[in-house]
From Swiss-Prot:
<dbReference type="Pfam" id="PF13934">
    <property type="entry name" value="ELYS"/>
</dbReference>
<keyword id="KW-0963">Cytoplasm</keyword>
<dbReference type="GO" id="GO:0005643">
    <property type="term" value="C:nuclear pore"/>
</dbReference>
<protein>
    <recommendedName>
        <fullName>Uncharacterized protein ely5</fullName>
    </recommendedName>
</protein>
<keyword id="KW-0539">Nucleus</keyword>
<dbReference type="GO" id="GO:0005634">
    <property type="term" value="C:nucleus"/>
</dbReference>
<dbReference type="GO" id="GO:0051292">
    <property type="term" value="P:nuclear pore complex assembly"/>
</dbReference>
<dbReference type="GO" id="GO:0005829">
    <property type="term" value="C:cytosol"/>
</dbReference>
<dbReference type="InterPro" id="IPR025151">
    <property type="entry name" value="ELYS_dom"/>
</dbReference>
Length: 298
């Protein structure tokens, strides 16, 4: 451990405590933090990523959570002697002091700007997979999250699709990779197929997203979106992908949508052949309409 000067020791004691009974990182808390770390998409806490900006830190996970007061002093000295500015140091201490339930008092003592408090609160709650609390802090005015890629991936991998949509809509991070486009489109499609479809058309790999969107709504048995698909002015490539997927299974929603699509595209003969070979389709409303349509054209 680096040797502390007297003024540094006073600051340390003023921030934390030298009493063992005050030390919050017991085995239960330590295990919880390590579990949260393993559940992160890249096995890194947001605090790990922040610590990695300090020159010389190669393994942030070995520093947090500290296993003893000596370890905490070592982390304190690394931050104190680091190449980062005072405001960033205060942000690190604010995050650590949340574990000690002293962060609010500290922020008042050093006049830590509110937007930085909310930013660190957001990261703290993301690290603990408390997504609603995290988003409520990260979407406040003047808060500028600086790890949008990790935030998007974290929300998507934890199936927090509404929060992801809110984050993208409010913060407006550049969706400049296919993975980010994919996370957003496949979140959006769960709530608005039409909005997701229009977004998909502007993406770098629209047909790949189109196939993923169709698979998702079919697998989730989203009948309303399937009805909407049939009425869309699809391109030839989109139609080919759609027909291929619909013909891949004999499940009811696949068959219903395929029959409706064949009727809509005026492929009456193929629609009649499909319905005649399916007991399920013979009972459908689309089949009744199909036979009326066929009798009128005969």
């Amino acid at each position: 451990m680096l040797k502390m000067e007297d003024d540094q020791f006073e600051r340390f004691v003023g921030l934390f405590s030298m009493k063992d009974e005050d030390f919050p990182y017991n085995s239960q808390v330590t295990n919880e933090i390590q579990t949260f770390r393993k559940q992160q998409v890249d096995s890194q806490l947001f605090f790990d990523v922040l610590l990695s900006f300090i020159e010389g830190i190669e393994d942030p996970s070995s520093l947090y959570p500290p296993k003893s007061i000596d370890d905490l002093q070592s982390l304190f000295m690394i931050i104190e002697n680091s190449n980062i500015d005072e405001l960033k140091q205060q942000c690190f201490y604010y995050y650590l002091l949340k574990d000690w339930e002293k962060s609010e008092t500290y922020s008042e003592q050093v006049s830590l700007p509110k937007n930085y408090q909310h930013l660190m609160d957001g990261y703290y709650y993301l690290d603990r997979l408390k997504f609603e609390e995290a988003i409520n802090h990260l979407l406040l005015p003047d808060v500028l999250p600086n790890f949008p890629d990790k935030i998007i991936e974290t929300l998507y991998s934890n199936e927090k699709y509404k929060f992801l949509i809110r984050f993208v809509s409010f913060v407006g991070p550049p969706l400049d990779t296919f993975r980010k486009e994919e996370c957003y489109a496949l979140s959006l499609v769960r709530y608005s197929f039409l909005a997701s479809y229009h977004y998909m058309k502007k993406c770098t790999k629209p047909l790949v997203l189109w196939e993923e969107m169709i698979q998702l709504i079919l697998e989730s048995n989203d009948t309303q979106s399937c009805k909407l698909i049939v009425s869309l002015p699809l391109s030839q490539e989109e139609c080919e992908v759609l027909f291929s997927l619909l013909r891949s299974k004999k499940e009811p929603l696949y068959l219903n949508t395929l029959l409706a699509l064949l009727v809509e595209s005026n492929n009456i003969q193929e629609a009649l052949e499909l319905s005649s070979n399916s007991t399920h389709l013979q009972k459908s409303a689309v089949n009744t309409y199909l036979h009326k349509l066929n009798s009128l054209s005969s």
